[in-house]
């Protein structure tokens, strides 16, 4: 290999350094790596508190003297047959699709099922006729659901991506779902805890998104969160 790129901003596990030695690439690029670590040919200084994660692409492209246009956008590939399958499924639902994910990588950042029930009631009252699709691959949602609400019937990540790509609105506290929505510039309401390093670095990063910051405590304990989400809803779906 001529160039290897280690895009991680924080971690530097020993097994990765061993992998670099085994591959023996001519050049290894990284971010915020200690000068004493000789496995890297060049390390970019990256300000995780001020910059968005997409700036990593810009720094690499500048260093390699590549065209930087369009580097602020994600490009996710979903197989055509899966996009068609999901399109047919959405066409079978009554109303415009709203994809809701209440789960994050940590329980402190997840919405509660009580919040979900309140959100569904207020969402359907605000936009009657909408169809809500809940992402729940672990099958953890236990609350009774109204007829307009369904659990995602598909089991693959590609299907979840296709749902997000074709939905009218996404609501999520999880940054992986947030950045899937960003790939297709979908209307999004993203819920974040007030963690500076996370809120700027992993922000949605596009104009069609609304970012709600929960200032203190755990997301699932925030009593006024649902009203803030409803207030951020677009007027038309």
Language-model features: where?
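Catalytic machinery of carbohydrate-active enzymes
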Residues: 1-237
């Amino acid at each position: 290999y001529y160039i290897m790129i280690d895009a991680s901003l924080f971690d530097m596990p020993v097994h990765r350094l061993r992998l670099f030695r085994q591959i023996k690439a001519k050049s290894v690029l990284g971010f915020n790596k200690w000068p004493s670590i000789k496995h890297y040919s060049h390390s970019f200084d990256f300000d995780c508190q001020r910059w968005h994660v997409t700036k990593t692409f810009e720094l690499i492209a500048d260093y390699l003297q590549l065209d930087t246009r369009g580097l602020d956008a994600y490009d996710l590939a979903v197989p055509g047959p899966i996009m068609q399958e999901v399109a047919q499924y959405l066409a079978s639902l009554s109303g415009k699709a709203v994809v809701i994910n209440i789960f994050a990588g940590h329980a402190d950042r997840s919405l509660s099922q009580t919040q979900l029930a309140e959100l569904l009631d207020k969402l359907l009252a605000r936009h009657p006729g909408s169809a809500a699709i809940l992402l729940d691959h672990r099958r953890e949602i236990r609350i009774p659901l109204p007829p307009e609400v369904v659990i995602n019937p598909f089991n693959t990540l590609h299907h979840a991506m296709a749902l997000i790509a074709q939905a009218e609105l996404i609501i999520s506290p999880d940054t992986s779902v947030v950045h899937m929505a960003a790939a297709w510039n979908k209307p999004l309401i993203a819920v974040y805890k007030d963690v500076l390093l996370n809120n700027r670095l992993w922000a949605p990063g596009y104009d069609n998104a609304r970012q709600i910051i929960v200032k203190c405590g755990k997301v699932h304990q925030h009593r006024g969160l649902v009203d803030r989400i409803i207030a951020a809803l677009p007027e038309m779906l």
